[in-house]
Design a protein with these regions (language model features):
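Generic beta-sheet signal
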Residues: 34-36, 53, 102, 123-126, ...
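Phosphate/nucleotide-donor binding subsite
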Residues: 49-98, 147-156, 173
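N-terminal subdomain of nucleotide-sugar transferases
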Residues: 1-49
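Structural motif
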Residues: 2, 97-98, 196
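Conserved nucleotide-sugar donor-interacting segment of glycosyltransferase catalytic cores
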Residues: 82-151, 204-206
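Short, structured coil segments at secondary-structure junctions
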Residues: 46-47, 116-118, 193, 216-218
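A nucleotide-sugar donor-handling region in carbohydrate enzymes
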Residues: 34, 160-223
């Protein structure tokens, strides 16, 4: 059995997937990782195959690249990011039996898994990534977000967050899905996070606040 583990981020995003990969290897699985090129030499030294994706994170860690761009340049970068993901993850996933994606920039992996007819699992490292009436969505300053008041209506904020996901990524993702013969995505955030994500966080330090409103929250498995 072969598993593809994919993330786009810095060391804190990559290392948990590497730990998962080592455990899967110990169980006899073949593991392949899609990660930024910075980590290739280290991970290959652990006996796992690496397919580089995205830019080196060292070059983007000091300044948020989107914060310094015009809206048109932001759109071009977003389109390029999605196109690169569909190409890279699409090639890396060939011959794999499952895709595990971590961090919310997994914009192509769910479509690639659907196209190949294999399972896809999204993993969050912190409860705040996942919709819940008990906390606010992540604050993205480059998008113009500001921290909400302590007693804000979190459900309304999550509803707006879903609208923002659709506005930012919907048409870009749907264009690539159409090329694969897949239907458009109605809810981009749910498409990325899935309805049954894993929460890889210590249940004491980062517990999932159950019970919750099933109409607005996914069914979370805390690992």
């Amino acid at each position: 059995m072969r598993a593809l583990l994919s993330t786009i981020g810095s060391r804190g995003d990559v290392q948990p997937l590497v730990a998962l990969g080592e455990q899967l290897q110990a169980l006899g699985l073949e593991v392949r990782l899609c990660v930024p090129p910075d980590f290739r030499e280290w991970i290959e030294g652990l006996g796992m195959a690496v397919v580089p994706i995205g830019p080196e994170v060292r070059s983007t860690g000091k300044v948020d690249p989107l914060a310094t761009l015009t809206p048109q340049q932001q759109r071009q970068m977003m389109e390029g990011t999605v196109a690169s993901q569909f190409e890279t993850i699409g090639a890396a996933a060939r011959g794999c039996d499952i895709i595990v994606g971590a961090t919310a920039l997994q914009l192509a992996a769910p479509s690639v898994a659907q196209h190949l007819g294999i399972p896809y699992v999204f993993v969050a490292y912190c409860p705040i990534v996942l919709p819940s009436r008990h906390h606010a969505p992540p604050v993205l300053t480059w998008r113009g977000d500001a921290p909400p008041p302590a007693m804000a209506d979190y459900r309304a904020l999550w509803a707006k967050d879903a609208q923002d996901w659709n506005a930012m990524w919907g048409s870009i993702i749907d264009a690539h899905r159409a090329a694969l013969g897949l239907a458009p995505v109605g809810d981009v955030r749910s498409y990325v996070l899935t309805n049954q994500p894993w929460l890889a966080a210590d249940p004491t330090l980062g517990p999932w606040p159950e019970p919750d409103d099933a109409a607005t929250s996914p069914t979370v498995t805390q690992t």
